A protein has these predicted regions:
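Conserved hydrophobic beta-strand positions in leucine-rich repeat
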Residues: 69-71, 91-93, 112-114, 134-136, ...
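Tyrosine-centered aromatic motifs in long, intrinsically disordered, low-complexity repeat arrays
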Residues: 85, 106, 128, 149, ...
Length: 423
């Protein structure tokens, strides 16, 4: 009986030891994730995991996994193993190739940035309800499922094949960029009360855009589309508006934009531009339109004006004493008045019909191109930078009938060969 008792005790001890060893192994498997090629077969993913192994023991502890709240992956082809990092709040994937992944595991995700091709042509973010920032650049993306009720503040979509995008449920959006999506022909961003920055550019068949009633909007960029209709009523706080290269745009109403400082509307078919309510304007780019007149008497802070290639016959910038750069070539101008504009450093007015040009009050002038006019004399004696240029730079007569002196991009002077230059 005694021996039987001892054997029983020994057997119990052995069993307990085995159980202890077995439980320890389970605990270890639960607590650690090996950083190896089996778990992370892609080289880029493997290196990303190694970067999270802070104690360099080739394992990821629970603490290391939980502390990984952001990850950057560049050039991966396989995202296998990413789901190990369950606490991620920010994921950035760049230069990915033929990727496919389900992001539903990341319930804490707040920021997602994807750049690359997506093999499934579909990205489903319906489970990521905490997302605040989404940026997707994927040239073969045809379907995007957004999370309902997510507190989105920033959204960027570029180079996709989507035919449209509906963001009307996300009224908290502050910044939206929709660029180079060739299948979109109409977009509506009306009634976004928090929207501050909107870029909708280089969408080559985009014909209609509604941006009305966005009271906080300050920056609007709609360059390089095919717009014929642009509704920006109810956006009275716009400070910067760029709508260049929309070849079907024939009108532009900026009367409500009293805070406007920058207006770039070049390469359109705009016939008239009323700036009488834009006293803060400092930069105006309106070249290659159909303007027959341009009233600048209400823009005293204007510093830069580029109105080349319009149908202007006269131009008066004398009400703009702050102007430094003026380009008005190829406009059929017979009159150009910039009296009192003593701060001008660059004047480009070639190929017009000017018979006189007085720059004696422009002591800082360093860039003057005035060839192709009807000038007989040119007095540069009060412009020391131009006088010095003629003394130090080589004379270039390669362009027939014209003389040019050039000092890199610093100074330039060009005039007709047969005029008298007073220096």
């Amino acid at each position: 009986m005694k021996r039987i008792g001892i054997g029983f005790v020994l057997s119990a001890v052995a069993l307990a030891s085995l159980l202890s060893l077995s439980l320890s192994g389970c605990k270890g498997r639960e607590k650690y994730v090996n950083v190896d090629r089996k778990k992370f077969p892609d080289e880029v993913m493997y290196e990303a995991a190694r970067a999270k192994d802070t104690d360099h023991d080739t394992k990821l502890s629970q603490a290391e996994i939980e502390s990984a709240t952001s990850i950057l992956i560049e050039g991966a082809k396989d995202l296998k193993g990413l789901d190990v990092f369950t606490n991620l709040e920010s994921i950035t994937i760049r230069d990915g190739e033929n990727m496919k992944y389900d992001f539903k595991h990341f319930t804490n995700l707040r920021s997602l940035s994807i750049e690359g091709t997506w093999s499934s042509n579909r990205i489903d973010l319906s489970g990521n309800t905490k997302l605040e920032k989404i940026k997707i650049t994927s040239k073969n993306l045809q379907e995007l499922v957004l999370p309902e009720g997510a507190p989105l503040k920033e959204f960027t979509l570029s180079r996709s094949l989507l035919k449209g995008i509906d963001l009307s449920s996300y009224k908290g959006l502050q910044k939206v960029h929709i660029e180079t999506n060739d299948n979109m022909n109409e977009l509506d961003f009306s009634d976004f009360p928090e929207l501050v920055d909107l870029t909708v550019s280089a969408n080559k068949i985009l014909y209609t855009l509604n941006v009305s009633n966005c009271p906080k909007l300050t920056t609007l960029d709609v360059n390089y589309n095919n717009l014929a209709n642009l509704n920006i009523s109810g956006c009275s706080n716009i400070e910067k508006l760029t709508c260049a290269w929309n070849k079907n745009l024939t009108s532009l109403d900026v009367a409500a934009f009293t805070k406007l400082t920058v207006l770039e509307c070049d390469k359109n078919k705009i016939a008239a531009l009323d700036l009488s309510h834009c006293p803060e304007l400092t930069r105006l780019v309106c070249y290659e339109n159909c303007l027959t007149s341009l009233d600048l008497s209400y823009t005293p802070k204007l510093k830069e004006l580029y109105c080349t290639d319009n149908d202007l016959t006269e131009l008066d910038v004398s009400c703009c004493p702050e102007i430094t750069n003026l380009s008005c070539c190829r406009c059929s101008l017979s009159t150009l008045n910039f009296a009192g504009c003593d701060k001008i450093t660059s004047l480009v007015c070639y190929d017009n019909k000017l018979t006189s040009l007085d720059i004696t009050h422009c002591a800082g002038m360093r860039w003057l191109l005035c060839s192709g006019n009807n000038l007989t004399t040119l007095d540069i004696s009060k412009c020391p930078k131009l006088v010095d240029l003629m003394k130090t730079a080589d004379r270039d007569e390669k362009k027939e009938g014209r003389v040019k002196y050039e000092d890199g991009d610093i100074r330039m002077l060009e005039f007709d060969k047969d005029i008298e230059v007073i220096k």
